[in-house]
Amino acid sequence: DDLPIPFRCVSADAVTGERIVHESGSLVSAIRSSISIPLVFSPYPYEDDRLVVDGGVVDNLPIALARSLGADIVIASDVNALQLQSYEELESLSVMAMQTVILVTQEKAAMQHPLADLLFLPDLRDIYSLDFTKSEQIIERGRQAVEAKRDELAALAEKIESSRGLVALDSNRNGAYSLQPTPTILQ
């Protein structure tokens, strides 16, 4: 809450599936908790001896959560995409497990689309969701999605500015990232 705009992220209890909204404490720990993608990163230790995983397991596009926390404008980017095009691609148990997760999270995310003021849908169908070697392509697809909605983005910015004004960028602002403790990562 010390940030100019309150930051929230979501993780899930690895045993109970309880959604955990990180509202205070270490920003580094909150982010590390929320990116603990199952089968990629180990679960992250959370208070009370619990382990947490990526919040996408329970809420991969938390637009409704943002609204419930008081967000009056929500700009979202849905990066859920079905990558498989045929049954032959279900070549292993791990691919089947990932496809199952994608099917569930994609349906949940799509239900929240109407709640966003502006929604970007980058075309990532041909990029495997865990392929971290294609970051440049992913960023470019994101740029294309934003460019496709340039007029809507400009209209939203105009609406915000007319209602309350935009805050000027302060290039001298120093964040508190360097003050955060280093998280312990399970091996």
Can you name each region flagged by the protein language model?
Residues 1-187:
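Patatin-like phospholipase
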